[in-house]
Structure formats: C-alpha cells, structure tokens
C-alpha cells in the first residue's frame, strides 16, 4: 500500500513540474498585434508562443510594455503578468484561428497624447526560463488623444457685407460660436456660428464673411469664407460649414471672423 501511494505521489509531482516549467519549453514568439476593444473600453496585446516544433503552447510569462505615439510621446509603460488562463483561441480574417495570449490594458492607464497612432513595444520573458528580444507592432488610429481649445471673438460682432462698389449691402451680426472636436480616425474641428441678418435684402443670393484659424504660436492654420444663403433682414441663422482637418490634439486655437474683402 505504501508503494502504491509513493508511485502516485511521484506521478503527481512529475505532472506538476511539467506544468510549472512550460515557459522553459517556449522557443518562438509569434503573431503579435494590438487593438482597441470598444465594447469593454480596453486594449488587447495579442501574441503566441510555440515550442521548438512550432506547436502552440501557453506559459506563465511577464511582459514589459511601452507605447509611443507618432508624436514621440510615451503614453504607457508597465509590466503585465500573463498566466496560462490568459491564452485562448482567436480568429481573424487574415490569419484564421490562432492560440494566443490576450494581455489587456485598461483605457484609463494610457495617457492622452497628440497622435492617435503609434507603436507598441514589448518584451516577453520569464526569469530563468525564457527571454525574447523586444518586438513591436502598430497601434493604428486607436490611441487616446488630447482635447483642443478654441478661443472666439467677443460677441455680438457686427460684420458689414460690401458689394462690388464697396458700399455696405448688409450687416451680419454674429451672436455666438462653438466648436466640436471629432477624435475618431483623423481628428477634425467643426465650427458652428449663430447670428442674425440685421439689414439688407436677399437679392444678392448670399452674404459672405471670412474666417481665420491660428494656433497658439500665432501661425495661420486655415482660412476661408462662410456663405450665408438667401437671408432677409431679421432672419436668424446657424451655420456649421467650417470643417478643418489639419488639427493637432492638445493645441489651443484662436478663431477669428472678419468682413470679406473683394
């Protein structure tokens, strides 16, 4: 009876030692990628491990991760411990089904920066068992970006609209302005102005005013004209036709309106 228990004890020890040393059997790091998970508001760093024969396996490993955006800002640095429970089968259209580790990073742990794209650098290792060189993958249009600030003129602001002869054809009063910063994919800024036509007729077809957008250093970023169609005296309007695409996250802008010059 003692021999029976001794044999089974040795079997259990061997099985446990085999599970615990799985990191030492790892020979290959492969199939890494990075994505944002909209449903859970976090990020996933995927990678696969394989033995010397290319057979996928799981292992308890540590992962040093740092994320640097395209503005050369380090927005994340940390170490995650990965267990065999973090491995599973994942399917993609490009690679089919793969056995991968899913290392999750909460969105709140990644700082907002000046670019939504960048690189994810990571090193997979386990002390006294396995050590891989640092590798990287792309983070495309998924990193958090900073808000922008826009300063407007003091309102109300009366702007004269001149005709070809230089005479005042109408007066447009700007009563307010606001902005919307869209962070999805390519950042863009939408400016909405509200106001009233104080004088003039609708015979000209449209009233035209000009705008300019400056950055915090005083450089002109964008300029153009706003066309207000078929307004009669006393008509109120709301215009959101100004959409600017060349926007830097985290920047402070000044938006100025002026009379159009022929």
What is the meaning of each model-derived region?
Residues 15-18:
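C-terminal motif of bacterial Sec signal peptides marking the signal peptidase cleavage site
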Residues 61-63, 170, 205-209, 251-253:
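Short beta-strand/loop motifs in extracellular/secreted proteins, especially
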Residues 53-60, 111-113, 198-206:
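A short beta-turn/strand-edge loop motif at beta-sheet boundaries
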Residues 65-69, 211-215:
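Conserved aromatic beta-strand anchor motif in extracellular beta-sandwich/beta-rich domains
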Residues 21-42, 139-188:
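Transition segment at domain starts
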Residues 36-50, 58-60, 100-102, 185-192:
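Contiguous beta-strand segments within globular domains
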Residues 74-144, 216-262:
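Short, solvent-exposed, Trp/other aromatic-anchored flexible loops in extracytoplasmic proteins
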Residues 1-4:
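Positively charged n-region of N-terminal signal peptides that target proteins for export
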